[in-house]
Amino acid sequence: MTIENDYAKLKELMEFPAKMTFKVAGINREGLAQDLIQVVQKYIKGDYIPKEKRSSKGTYNSVSIDIIAENFDQVETLYKELAKVEGVKMVI
């Protein structure tokens, strides 16, 4: 199965506007949450309060951001753009 197929299935199943949480796992570094918020605000304006949780050894950080997407293109774009942020390992 390809990413394009996954996006096509997701697009069929979703209804908009849709409340979603993006969870991003990355290397623990100063400014990670702020960098992620800047990306989200570029595509969906609003005030966001990220929830952060560090790994037990402090190596990794997970950041959750709640959004309301107006269309599937916003969702697809955020998955791709959040993955490009320095230190990001995974976007869920």
Swiss-Prot record:
SUPFAM superfamilies on file: YbeD/HP0495-like (SSF117991)
InterPro entries: UPF0250_YbeD-like, YbeD-like_sf
Protein name (record): UPF0250 protein HI_0028
Any one annotated GO CC term: cytosol
Domain of life per record: Bacteria
Source organism of the structure: Haemophilus influenzae (strain ATCC 51907 / DSM 11121 / KW20 / Rd)
Family: Belongs to the UPF0250 family.
Disulfide-bonded cysteines: none
Signal peptide, first to last residue: none
